[in-house]
Amino acid sequence: MDLGFAVPVSGSWATPEHMVHIARRAEQLGYHSLWTFQRLLAPADLGWSETYHSVQDPLTTLAFLAAHTTRVRLGVAVLNMPFLSPVVLAKQTATLDILSAGRLDVGLGLGWSDEEYQATGASKHRRGRRAEEFVTVLRGLWQDEVTEHHGEFYQVPPTRMDPKPVQRPHPPILLGGLAPQALRRAGRLADGWVSGSQADLAAIGAAIATVKATAADAGRDPGALRFVCRGAVRVRPGGPTDREPLTGSLDQIRSDLGRLAEAGVTELFVDLNFDPEIGSPRADAEASRRRADEVLDALAPRR
């Protein structure tokens, strides 16, 4: 199982200096990838988790870090398709793949925030079918010399989009979502599946099995798919025995990583943005960076 690390994008520690520090340190330590996530806004009463109160844009962050790294892959988990144009996203991500010399992974999801749906003018009606068409348009723009699409939701006249991404036929698409239909969609359409912050990690093997079975039914090779897990790590030594996976001492977290690999996860990225003691506006930014350094060193793949 490959290990990645989420860069600071949420809360007080999400500064340019800390982003570069974490990205470079992760690359030096042998981590496979760096990750971000998307959150456009938060409700005025701030009723959500503090992780979502102040979040940097994911693609802009990855473009910034592409200039400060050379080897690690750069991923977003996830961009929410209902809020985006597949044509604009195709251009943005093709450019980012070029700037990063072919290191981009594109995670896509449907979103869950009513506030974001309303603010962006998006509709939840038939959003699953719209997502499938979104992926079709995105792939066509990335890989075809001339693409044309006439569907229920998107109309693309005979069109060229250049320059193309470095990765051929296109950057990997990882679809998110926990609902059965989302898992089946990933098996039919995507290059892999990425779990969200609310995923039941104890049951992740069943989700992976659903994706694989659907891929096989569609005539695809399940063994070629990637299964990426967002590891919302919280280092809490001396915690309760009935702890959540990836919450506990570093030794316990290492054991959890092994169990997730056995469950079929092919890549996990450690995400401290979802620790309220780190990824919140009220957290001490320097203390958060120091804690991240400790986790980076302790879980480094080379050890």
Task: Please describe what each predicted stretch is.
Residues M1-H68, P169-P171, N273, I278-A298:
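N-terminal beta1-alpha1-beta2 module of alpha/beta enzyme domains
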Residues L3-V7, L34-T36, L74-A77, L104-L108, ...:
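Hydrophobic faces of well-ordered beta-strands that scaffold small-molecule active sites
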Residues F5-P16, L79-V87, Q167-L178, P237-D251:
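Active-site mouth loops of central-metabolism enzymes
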Residues P8-S10, R39-L41, L79-M81, G109-E115, ...:
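Active-site beta-loop-alpha junctions enriched in small/polar residues
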Residues A14-A26, V88-Q92, L175-R185, L246-L260:
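Short, acidic/polar
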Residues H18, A42-S49, A63, V76, ...:
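Internal, glycine-rich beta/alpha segment that forms the wall or movable "lid"
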Residues E27-Q28, H32, H125-V166, G196-R303:
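An alpha-helical appendage that flanks or caps ligand/catalytic pockets
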Residues H68-R71, S100, G187-W193, G264-T266:
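Glycine-enriched alpha-helix->loop->beta-strand junction motifs that scaffold or abut catalytic
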